[in-house]
Amino acid sequence: MAASAVCRAACSGTQVLLRTRRSPALLRLPALRGTATFAQALQSVPETQVSILDNGLRVASEQSSHATCTVGVWIDAGSRYETEKNNGAGYFLEHLAFKGTKNRPGNALEKEVESIGAHLNAYSTREHTAYLIKALSKDLPKVVELLADIVQNSSLEDSQIEKERDVILREMQENDASMQNVVFDYLHATAFQGTPLAQAVEGPSENVRRLSRTDLTDYLNRHYKAPRMVLAAAGGVEHQQLLDLAQKHLSSVSRVYEEDAVPGLTPCRFTGSEIRHRDDALPLAHVAIAVEGPGWANPDNVTLQVANAIIGHYDCTYGGGVHLSSPLASVAVANKLCQSFQTFNISYSDTGLLGAHFVCDAMSIDDMVFFLQGQWMRLCTSATESEVTRGKNILRNALVSHLDGTTPVCEDIGRSLLTYGRRIPLAEWESRIQEVDAQMLRDICSKYFYDQCPAVAGYGPIEQLPDYNRIRSGMFWLRF
């Protein structure tokens, strides 16, 4: 009786609320409060402080109330700076960083990191290399000392190099088992064919077997220079303390290049082309289609990120069905077109890849390509203000939620100083997002998508992947 009474009371209360006429001004108040709160949150983000040592090494930090901190060294070095002969050297060096230094031989480095309860990590991309440690804020002096030892005093012992060859070769086998990784390597290989951006970060297996201590030392001496480095920190750190520690441990990093051979970026042209790797034994097809995108600092990036947010992403494990906000996701669910899809905007210094990747069964590839290109053409010709507003809100949410924790913030600081030369405040990102409207989005999408030659990579049972000329013809509409 009590439960039914509560139910009846709730229902009657709802009916009263529905009959009550509310002022439009009152209806707008929550939205106004939400907007004000978001704007205030942007203004309350801690300032990123940046200093430069005498040798050109940049020191940047964002202080917060966290009891932990993440500190890392970001270096302008990656597979784009490598040649066919030494491709993979940067990735090899990154692995050897954990295998001891001249001051901490063998596993002494890992033991010292574990003794303070810290986490040591490193990664390489096509343009950057990073070494980072997450630890308690009180251990900041030890963390900076360890990072300085890693980037300056790698032992590069012959025995460790030989051991690491097998480790890297096993990792490459594991990467080859990831169809998504393979497809994106294929996409770079065809889109930037004949240029350094076509090279994989790990390098070919023959290079891994052949690289010598001399090759690795030459690469380190050429690229690990102070003006190409950023020491970044986020969390419970004071900038002055970080600067003093950097001065103590990193001021000796050389800024002089041998024979004035300053590493430069080789221009990388984009080529509309395709790579197809058909394997009917695999259960699902992976396909990536991309046009040439803008570089990091290009202002068009914000508008294109809004466009990607409108198209969205999808996975068959999501709820929502045909009621998903993304038109492409709704069509994919209704027609059972794919297992998943995602949009991407991969930026480099002067170019990029802008497109989508999807996973589907063999008989759905043609339809998925058709609907994907239809969404691109629709954004070029008839994007509406309502969906642009939705895309902007999605981008705002992603921008803020991405910077949750000391490690993402530290990565953002290090990467931003290498790519933009500064850390762009969230308030500035918000103002750029706010400027985007439907007309701007249509113009920018037309510039990058409409009647452009795409790069296509397919892997798996891809017999039904349309011919390249047909895919190319889907990049424009005949409108009379």
UniProtKB/Swiss-Prot annotation:
The modification N6-acetyllysine is found at residues 111, 138, 163, 248. The modification N6-succinyllysine is found at residue 163. GO terms for cellular component: mitochondrial inner membrane; mitochondrion; myelin sheath; respiratory chain complex III. The modification Phosphothreonine is found at residue 214. Acetylation of Lys-138 is observed in liver mitochondria from fasted mice but not from fed mice. Residues 1-34 form a transit peptide. Its main location: mitochondrion. This is Cytochrome b-c1 complex subunit 1, mitochondrial. The gene is Uqcrc1. Component of the ubiquinol-cytochrome c oxidoreductase (cytochrome b-c1 complex, complex III, CIII), a multisubunit enzyme composed of 11 subunits. The complex is composed of 3 respiratory subunits cytochrome b, cytochrome c1 and Rieske protein UQCRFS1, 2 core protein subunits UQCRC1/QCR1 and UQCRC2/QCR2, and 6 low-molecular weight protein subunits UQCRH/QCR6, UQCRB/QCR7, UQCRQ/QCR8, UQCR10/QCR9, UQCR11/QCR10 and subunit 9, the cleavage product of Rieske protein UQCRFS1. Disruption phenotype: Results in early embryonic lethality. The modification Phosphoserine is found at residue 212. GO terms for molecular function: metal ion binding; protein-containing complex binding; ubiquitin protein ligase binding. Component of the ubiquinol-cytochrome c oxidoreductase, a multisubunit transmembrane complex that is part of the mitochondrial electron transport chain which drives oxidative phosphorylation. Belongs to the peptidase M16 family. UQCRC1/QCR1 subfamily. The keyword ATP-binding does not apply. PANTHER family: CYTOCHROME B-C1 COMPLEX SUBUNIT 1, MITOCHONDRIAL (PTHR11851:SF116), METALLOPROTEASE (PTHR11851). It is a peripheral membrane protein. It is found in: Mitochondrion inner membrane. Expressed in neurons and astrocytes of the cerebral cortex and hippocampus (at protein level). Transmembrane segments: none annotated.
